[in-house]
Swiss-Prot record:
The keyword Oxidoreductase applies. The keyword Chloroplast applies. Heterodimer of subunit A (variable subunit) and subunit B (catalytic subunit). Heterodimeric FTR forms a complex with ferredoxin and thioredoxin. [4Fe-4S] cluster binds at residues 83, 102, 104, 113. The lineage of its organism: Eukaryota, Viridiplantae, Streptophyta, Embryophyta, Tracheophyta. It is found in: Plastid, Chloroplast. Disulfide bonds join 85-115. It comes from Spinacia oleracea. The active site is at 85 (nucleophile). Binds 1 [4Fe-4S] cluster. It comes from the Eukaryota. This is Ferredoxin-thioredoxin reductase catalytic chain, chloroplastic. It catalyses: [thioredoxin]-disulfide + 2 reduced [2Fe-2S]-[ferredoxin] + 2 H(+) = [thioredoxin]-dithiol + 2 oxidized [2Fe-2S]-[ferredoxin]. Its cofactor is [4Fe-4S] cluster.
Amino acid sequence: MKALQASIAYSFPISSPAASPRRFSRVIRAQADPSDKSMEVMRKFSEQFCRKSDTYFCVDKSVTAVVIKGLADHRDTLGAPLCPCRHYDDKEAEAKQGFWNCPCVPMRERKECHCMLFLTPDNDFAGKEQTITLDEIREVTSNM
């Protein structure tokens, strides 16, 4: 069973005194956590890519956990591991285009990871680990 998270969006009109009063309703958005399968696929992918590219996870494992969860969510919702650390006007179009799908083009070409998922050994934030467990990811992201 997937856990649901709800967020409430409020809208407040800016009106002139002559404007008639309007009713605004609350909008509640539910968001399911990524599937266990996608979480495991993205966790394994991240570990393998670290080894292959001689990069390391961030010394703060919560950064790694949040990014992997974001990639898994995009894998479920968009069908591709679109970088979760960027803003997109049209996520579906970006996922199809592929430039920002993990590993993104800047990472593949220059070893530059905007998300801080894959860090070169000389990066001040690079840890010494290339592994993370599913339990670590769940623990860090459980209240998000």
